[in-house]
Amino acid sequence: MDNEKLKAIDAAMSQIEKQFGKGAIMKLGEQDILNIDAISTGCLSLDIALGIGGVPRGRVVEIYGPESSGKTTVALHILAEAQKKGGAAAFIDAEHALDPQYARALGVDIDNLVVSQPDTGEQALEIAEALVRSGAIDVIVVDSVAALVPKAEIEGEMGDSHVGLQARLMSQALRKLTGSINKSKCIAIFINQLREKVGIMFGNPETTPGGRALKFYASVRMDIRKIDTIKQGEEMIGNRVRVKVVKNKVAPPFKQAEFDIMYNEGISREGNIVDVGVKENIIQKSGAWFSYGDIRLGQGRENAKLFFKENIDIRSEVENKIREKYDLPIQKVKNEKPKIEKGTENNTK
């Protein structure tokens, strides 16, 4: 490109920046755009599947799946990781179902978590917009899109038809929110449920409520499913879960991650490190025995998990070796998250 054209472009860009502010226009190769900052999900295999070490800042993320598959659990882990980095987090509880005890057990600082339980879908999305525009929130979770009921539906009679109201509401909200989310580097996580299309004979009958807008605006979409129940003798102690990254605008999509969600504990970090460590040949498995170099971790996966729980330094060493292999940020040794108080109901959200 000749110098005259370059000068004209620079002059135009300078004029646009004066009129609309710094960051209104830029060249794509500028360094601060190329590096996409991410917040960890608290699950090593999911961070690897997402390709950038977590969920991207300044983007919309959708987590959807059947009931009790672990959607809220994954979202709460992301909130906890954001708070550990010194960030502020907000939770729009449209379902009115947030369990503070469970959130605390997952590592969420509930004393500093901003929570809203809105009456209508419009109110929920206006609160979300105000929080995003403040520029102070790092992660905001909306739980769930299906529970964002338009005001007209709440004030109307039971049985009244309100076709397309929720879809229009979501479309309008996302048009307004996307720019603010990007500028403030906030992560907006929308949790969504599943519905079935009526009369579908071929293809996948499953769909998510709230219209198509969220599918378009989301940079990352995660489909989370329970694939097995974890038992200790006859007692059920958790779920084995598979997450498929069905859309990813910041890394290659369609990668999968499997991990354990233990009741009252959340994602099993130790179990995840054992699984990924064996896959990457950092942990050796011989018969039922697991070992790391000359260190015997235990006989059976549960004993290996127990060893890592009791030896945090070795667990962190193994985790960081895996992270180095995938060019993910190195984790510092942290204290264990608090245990949930006795008497709290067993539940995987």
From Swiss-Prot:
A Pfam match: RecA_C
InterPro entries according to UniProt: AAA+_ATPase, DNA_recomb/repair_RecA, DNA_recomb/repair_RecA_CS, P-loop_NTPase, RecA-like_C, RecA-like_N, RecA_ATP-bd, RecA_C_sf
Subcellular location(s) of the protein: Cytoplasm
List GO terms (cellular component aspect).
Answer: cytosol
Membrane-crossing residue ranges in chain numbering: none
- Key word Hydrolase present in the record? no
Q: Which residues bind ATP?
A: 65-72
Question: In Gene Ontology terms, what is one molecular function of this protein?
Answer: single-stranded DNA binding
Give the GO terms filed under biological process for this record: DNA recombination; DNA repair; SOS response
Q: Which UniProt keywords apply?
A: ATP-binding, Cytoplasm, DNA damage, DNA recombination, DNA repair, DNA-binding, Nucleotide-binding, SOS response
The UniProt function text for this chain reads: Can catalyze the hydrolysis of ATP in the presence of single-stranded DNA, the ATP-dependent uptake of single-stranded DNA by duplex DNA, and the ATP-dependent hybridization of homologous single-stranded DNAs. It interacts with LexA causing its activation and leading to its autocatalytic cleavage.
| Family per record | Belongs to the RecA family.
Q: Which NCBIfam families match?
A: tigrfam_recA
| Protein name listed in UniProt | Protein RecA
Whose protein is this, by species? Clostridium acetobutylicum (strain ATCC 824 / DSM 792 / JCM 1419 / IAM 19013 / LMG 5710 / NBRC 13948 / NRRL B-527 / VKM B-1787 / 2291 / W)
Q: Which gene encodes it?
A: recA
